[in-house]
Amino acid sequence: MSDAGGDVQVAPAAVAQGPMDKEGALRAVLRAAHHADGLAKGLHETCKALDKREAHFCVLAENCDEPQYVKLVETLCAEHQIPLIKVADKKIIGEYCGLCKYDKEGKARKVVGCSSAVVTNWGNEEQGRAILTDYFASKN
């Protein structure tokens, strides 16, 4: 085999598209945690992870159907000093956690709502992790 050929340029895996905000960091971290099998979705899994103190942080929907669910998750987070992020809609959490189908254009379709989620393994998203840890530090 000869080396007759031009140089092959490889595109970087993730191109930085400017500074990442809290929402973008949350989306990236939840997707990375989903791929690394470090995401607990739903009330039952969330409460188990919070009780075992395995959670790095928790995400809770503000439009949760049951006020007792909200109270339970907030209390567990406060008791175990686990950071809590509130999101406006449970469909947003469902989309970020991968509970949806994507069409040809890459838009989320048939999104299933998710009231709460917990990250137990960060995955390989370093930029989002740094932004969220800075956010948690500034919040306290």
UniProtKB/Swiss-Prot annotation:
GO terms for biological process, alphabetical: maintenance of translational fidelity; ribosomal small subunit biogenesis
The record, for Gene3D superfamilies, names: 3.30.1330.30
Specify whether Ribosomal protein is a keyword of the entry. Answer: yes
Q: Does the keyword Ribosomal protein apply?
A: yes
Concerning InterPro entries, the annotation shows:
Ribosomal_eL30-like_sf (IPR029064), Ribosomal_eL8/eL30/eS12/Gad45 (IPR004038), Ribosomal_eS12 (IPR000530), Ribosomal_eS12_CS (IPR047860)
Task: Report the domain of life of the source organism.
Answer: Eukaryota
Q: Which UniProt keywords apply?
A: Nucleus, Ribonucleoprotein, Ribosomal protein
Assembly information from the UniProt record: Part of the small subunit (SSU) processome, composed of more than 70 proteins and the RNA chaperone small nucleolar RNA (snoRNA) U3. Subunit of the 40S ribosomal complex.
Q: What does this protein do?
A: Part of the small subunit (SSU) processome, first precursor of the small eukaryotic ribosomal subunit. During the assembly of the SSU processome in the nucleolus, many ribosome biogenesis factors, an RNA chaperone and ribosomal proteins associate with the nascent pre-rRNA and work in concert to generate RNA folding, modifications, rearrangements and cleavage as well as targeted degradation of pre-ribosomal RNA by the RNA exosome. Subunit of the 40S ribosomal complex. Involved in cold-warm shock-induced translocation of the RNA exosome components from the nucleolus to nucleoplasm.
User: Would you tell me the protein name for this molecule?
Assistant: Small ribosomal subunit protein eS12
Q: Which organism is it from?
A: Caenorhabditis elegans
Q: What lineage is on file?
A: Eukaryota, Metazoa, Ecdysozoa, Nematoda, Chromadorea
